[in-house]
Amino acid sequence: GTSVITALTAQNTKGVHGIYPATADFVPAHLHAVIDDFALKAVKTGMLFNAEIVETIVSVMESKEIPLIVDPVMIAKGGASLLKEQATIALKEKLLPVATVCTPNIPEAEVLTGLTIKTEEEIKFAGEYLLNLGMQCVVIKGGHLAGKHAIDTVFIRGEKPFKMKTERLKTIHTHGTGCTFSAAITAEIAKGKPLKTAIIEAKSLFN
């Protein structure tokens, strides 16, 4: 795989100490450099931080027939905001409609839908709401809900929603499990796996 830098962070397992976004002209230059050199099979976005960067990604990717996986990174584990308010609006209105898969956790899904999500019925409503923005698939990660297990709910257009359950990992020493999960989905899609298979196999890394 390869990457395009959208922002730099000064952080550790305790929190984020600084965020330094890439310039608006650097991101498309870097993205085009990667696209021109590699036959990309899938692309994942992570922390985009501001609206300019979101709109840059949209302007490039909307003309490409490359599966786009959006991990809507908004809030760091320690509580720091990783996506500005205008960027959140741009992500919802412009990036998600051109995405293939979106992988919000519960707080991110609440921001994107404007709903309070505490029950299975509310998760179902949120998933359907997000699918209606134009994506093929939404994975709502349930790790923020109470319970012994972390339960993710998968919505694929035209199919019945299903759940994936794993033992909850309790640790203060690591973060980034959501990013790892979305990266694994991207890798499986890049291998040519169907959406459902790609998501299930990506989740198996956490069992």
Residue ranges and their predicted role:
Residues 123-131, 194-207:
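Short, well-structured alpha-helical segments that form the helix of a local strand-helix-strand
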Residues 1-77:
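Conserved N-terminal subdomain of the carbohydrate kinase-like
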Residues 85-161:
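Conserved phosphate/ATP/ADP-binding segment of small-molecule kinases
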Residues 52, 59-62, 159-161, 195-197:
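Nucleotide and nucleotide-moiety/phosphate-recognizing core
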Residues 111, 171-195, 199:
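Short, small-residue alpha-helix embedded
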Residues 3, 12-26, 78-85, 91, ...:
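Active-site-adjacent loop and "lid" segments of alpha/beta metabolic enzymes
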Residues 160-175:
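Short pre-catalytic strand/loop immediately N-terminal to key active-site residues, enriched for Gly-Thr
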